[in-house]
Swiss-Prot record:
Keywords (A to Z) from UniProt: Heme biosynthesis, Mitochondrion, Transit peptide
InterPro entries: TrmE/GcvT_dom1, YgfZ/GcvT, YgfZ/GcvT_CS
Compartments, as annotated in UniProt: Mitochondrion
NCBIfam families given in the database record: ygfZ_signature
Record's protein name: Iron-sulfur cluster assembly factor IBA57, mitochondrial
Domain of life: Eukaryota
Presequence extent in this chain: 1-50
Function: Mitochondrial protein involved in the maturation of mitochondrial [4Fe-4S]-proteins in the late stage of the iron-sulfur cluster assembly pathway. Required for normal heme biosynthesis.
Similarity field: Belongs to the GcvT family. CAF17/IBA57 subfamily.
Pfam families referenced in this protein's UniProt entry, alphabetically: Beta-barrel_CAF17_C
GO CC terms, sorted: mitochondrial matrix
Amino acid sequence: MQRMILFGGALREIVVRSGGLQAHYFLCTSRTRIKTHSQTRAASSTAHFSCYRLPHRTVLNVSGQDTSSFLQGIITNDMNLLGEDSLNAMYAHVLNVQGRTLYDIILYSLKGNPDGLNGVLLECDSTVQDSVMQLLKVYKIRRKVNLSVCPSLSLWALLPHSKEAVLGRPDVTTTDKVLVLEKDPRTELMGWRMITSAQDNPLDIVSACRLGNTEEYHRHRYEIGLPEGVGDLPPGEALPLEANLVYMQGISFSKGCYIGQELTARTHHTGVIRKRLMPVSLSAPAEKLNQGSALQTEGGKPAGKYRTGVDKLGLSLVRLAHAKETLQLKSSGDETVTVLASVPDWWPKTPQEK
């Protein structure tokens, strides 16, 4: 499956001049410290992955004989590919009728799963779990589909410590305790997704692994410029192509109709995207900034909007014409904050058609 770069000459110039971000295979940098908590120093030195519980994400089960066709008309990606050719995890957005993102989701195939569950597991932002369920029920109509929440399951992210770990699979010592273990479909720099029983400890399941806290996980996301959840992707506001959905393998342009498809397809075929969600470094802590604050150039020209962040890292929707400039915004205390955008290494470097 091919991909398409939809940005113009201005951003290509940034890629050449800046070289993009350095690949952040090593999480133990000056900006991202992995804390060992109760692990010993000896144990941490042999760990290949850091394991993060993701309480801000939740899991739903969608099952029944119409599951695939039901989701096919709702999500941006192609359900016909899930569960085929070893593709067992798929990223997608759910759009409104105007073509704006409502929810970002990851789907996990349960095909051949021996543990009683079937259909797919749907990962979404936990703060909008009820809204997602309500939306699915509205579109369900008379389809043979069952919907349920899964409070007995826990979702984990396994982030690699090295390039070798990125390319390798986590060593699972007790496979019967793992419901799902799949590469994060958005980018290899996000490691692996694992779903287990809420009662199980990942350290008893994965060898050469140590626990980290969720803030470290978010810091890594913002450092590499990967959006997740309603804070980064405000429902009804974010446009999927501006949010780099193509780069995260989250959309099919050949699957046919789905809700919100018209605007997305038209934008794709014109090839014009003037703004993109980009990682930014900040001169002040993100906690002092308001979501949606306007970005400006030093000359006062509109340059985009700030979204969210942690510490001095964050995401902003940046006008590509100004992406290589030093930008500014006002903090909640009316102080001027400097904003510098970067081009992630995991973005494609040459134009390709998906």
